[in-house]
Amino acid sequence: IHFLSDKLVEKGYADKRFESLVLNREIVAPTAYGNLFAMPHPIKKEGLENKIAVCSLNKSINWDDKKVRLIFLICLNKDSQESSFDELFDRIVSILDNPEKAEALIKEDNYSKFLNLFFEY
């Protein structure tokens, strides 16, 4: 969360409070969903722009007693429709609920190819 939050702040997509807002959300309800992925996000939409920071790990980490290798840090601005998050969440979950698709995304180390795979599914 720290690494990805820093990237969003560096690029001007979120302010310095973003990381603490995400960590506060994790305290309330961890965002590791099983099948090797997590989708952290703040409780409120506090981003400056709508962005997703993605991190694929070579080795899994423990995240609230679940193994995680693929992280989607969601950054939505306050003007975003709630349905935007719901649609994004549903899309990511539908892809990652399929172990073969999840593994293909985890293994892809080229960002352009990763995006192509993501949108292909």
Model-derived regions: residue spans:
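Cytosolic covalent-transfer regions centered on His/Cys nucleophiles
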Residues: I1-Y121
